[in-house]
Amino acid sequence: MIKLRLLFTTLLAIISLAAAAAAKDITMGFIYVGPKDDYGYNQAHAAGKEGVSKLPGVKTVEEAQVPETVAVQETMRNMIEIDGATVLFPTSFGYFDPHILKVAKQYPKVQFLHCGGLYTPGKHPANVGSYFGYIDEAQYICGIVAAHTSKTGKLGFIAAKPIPQVLRNINSFTLGARTVKPTITVQVIFTGDWAMPVKEAESANSLIDQGVDVLTCHVDSPKVIVQTAEKRGIYSCGYHANQSSVAPKGYLTGAEWDWTSVYSMYAKLLQEGKKLNDGGIPHLVRGGIKEGFVKVSPYGPAVSDAAKKDADAALAQFKNGTMVIYKGEIKDNTGKVVIPAGTELKQQDPVLEQMNYLVEGVVGSVK
């Protein structure tokens, strides 16, 4: 019996070693447009990089503060030729066209996975893919909490650019808020770029001066906006990462990423030898709260029990897949019907990734 046990243990060890050997060693390269400690977009991706780097057989390299210019092309080439990267994650929106598309053609054996871009079959190289999370689900919940908290009925949203992902966040936040208070408004200011701290502070103060009492945003680093809200004695909802430490009184909740789960999924597929080129890795990967791509920050001390109840109910619906944010009739803020009555657009519907409008209740323009 002892000999049999020893034999069984030995066989298990051999199988484990064989499985480990079968998993390919990979080098994953991560590129950020801003600093890794920005309390926001880049910090969230850097945290994901740290998470995946703990997996066996995974080596990671990274470079921060790489502008959306030809500079990112040089960074990508260096990671491939010097560091031996076999997969790259250029994380900023502006890296995609033309930079990723150009370099991907030059290195057909390297996988290029872009955060937020769209892959079009036949138009884009086969070794290019796109991943993103339905973080507008968390924004919808933030809208519920913000509406419960607001006394003026005026919410503020500071955003970088009116691209589809940003518009979707603004609209979902507004639709969530209007489930609580149907006449509440969300005033939007676009700063023009992802990291404009002076303009972000000016925009925050301007909105507060106009009666806004809850602020949120879609910029690379929400820190300035959240801090300004705290200094002015109003409330805020965070974005990308948890900013509660810079606003202990007024931070309500926030929409956060969990990139570790996403990057770990890619690492597993790549170690199995799968590629974008042969269909082993999907060209478009999306997920929300249910899939663990995004989450909601813990509630702050100013959040009421009523707000928690409604927010938790919506969270449960996202988790079980029954929540549909975009169901008609929905009008834009010019009065035009953009989603007819009886129409439901589920999160994975590609129509939502082409969003070019602001919903009713938003004060602002995409032009």
Model-identified regions with their sequence ranges:
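A residue-level marker of the well-folded mature domains of exported/periplasmic proteins
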Residues: A23-K367
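Bacterial N-terminal signal peptides that target proteins for export
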Residues: M1-F8
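Bacterial N-terminal signal peptides
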Residues: T9-A18
